[in-house]
Amino acid sequence: MAVLLMGAAMFTACDDNDNEQHEYIVPVTKGAFLVCSGNMSSNIDGSVSYLDYTSNQVANKQFQAQNGRSLGGTPNDALVYGSKMYIAVTGENTLEVVDAKTLKSLRQIKTNVTFGEGCLKPRHLTASGDKVYISFYGKSESSYDENWNATTKGNGYVVAIDTTTFTRQGIYEAGSFPEGISVADKKLYVCNSDYAACTKPSISIIDLTTGSGSLIKNDNIVNPQKIVLTAAGDMYVLDFGNYGDKKSGVYKISAKNNEVTRLIDANDMDCIGSNIFGYYTEFDASYKPVKTTYQVYNLLSQGTSTFYTDTNNEIIPACIGVDPVVGTVFIASNVKNADTGKTDYKANSKIFMFNVEYSQHGVFVSASKNANVWGATAGVGPCAFAFNVTTNVIKY
């Protein structure tokens, strides 16, 4: 994730001479992309769904529709940066670069061929300046004993590529099974998940100028997946837990002393300004979803609010996304199998949209259903949102 919490998304250009024309540039979101990983065991390829804000309609399998070919197996993440969208396709060892307006392919990159043989299984993306960064499982490997205790070995990588030539500009060794990444102040932050083995999870901090790095390790950080940063350098990490006694949640890692504090239970998170949105689902013994809590944590007040109460368990959330311009919240949901009551991972998903009101200081006030996009059909295996943000020039 490349979002800097508590940062302003305002672009202005003006002149003090009142006789000259003034203009300012306003970011505008045209729509939302939903990356869907498909279902590997059922041979269902991944896809991209697109919600157009003007029509409030969702169009599915848009990459395939525009390019006449499938994305392939298990796309995992996407990033809109400038005029392009980058899609990390884990199962194919490819990075797809497309025009963000049309989804027409600009380049299909075989990562282990173009970037180096260790660049296997691309996972997550972020960007800074003229570079896009991609995390790779790389040489990370896992194995299990007869009691299903996991052992991991080897490390992954993060590669920096030029946004014009798509050539490799740098490669950085990370830890075991790296996932989410972020860049700030010429430093690269990497969530080393250790594939939930809980033996050597960590956060890598790599100096992009010198290539030197350090690790943050803490007993509470056992399976880190996403990371966002404040201007002060504090880190906010989504950790999936150990699927046992340690629940998934959002943690703060202090920039002053690396102190780790748990903030909220969460299976996923996204943020805007000083607000972190997340959800947490509880399951019964047969792994049927029982209850989901939808919360927003504010960094300024350090308080937590509920932004939705799903009394009918209508939503089985799979991922969350927040429009970086206006703060609209989206949740992609799996659906229940009508016969078993369990989640059907082979069925099409649904998109649920929330209109959100913020104070003049950008603090969450309330959220409400958007009836125009409530339960819209999307692809199989939803896993990540990306937003089609462009700019308008207003002259005065």
Report the location of each language-model feature.
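Bacterial Sec-dependent N-terminal signal peptides
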Residues: 1-33
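Repeated scaffold domains used in trafficking and secretory/extracellular systems
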Residues: 22, 70-79, 116-127, 174-185, ...
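Conserved beta-strand positions in repeat-built beta-propeller and related beta-rich domains
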Residues: 34-43, 87-91, 134-144, 190-198, ...
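Structural motif
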Residues: 42-50, 94-97, 142-157, 197-205, ...
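Short loop/turn segments that connect beta-strands within beta-propeller blades
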Residues: 53-55, 99-103, 161-166, 206-211, ...
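A short beta-strand motif characteristic of beta-propeller blades
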Residues: 57-70, 104-116, 166-172, 211-218, ...
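Acidic, serine/threonine- and glycine-rich low-complexity intrinsically disordered segments
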Residues: 164-287
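Blade-level signature of beta-propeller repeat domains, shared across WD40, Kelch, NHL, RCC1
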Residues: 346-396
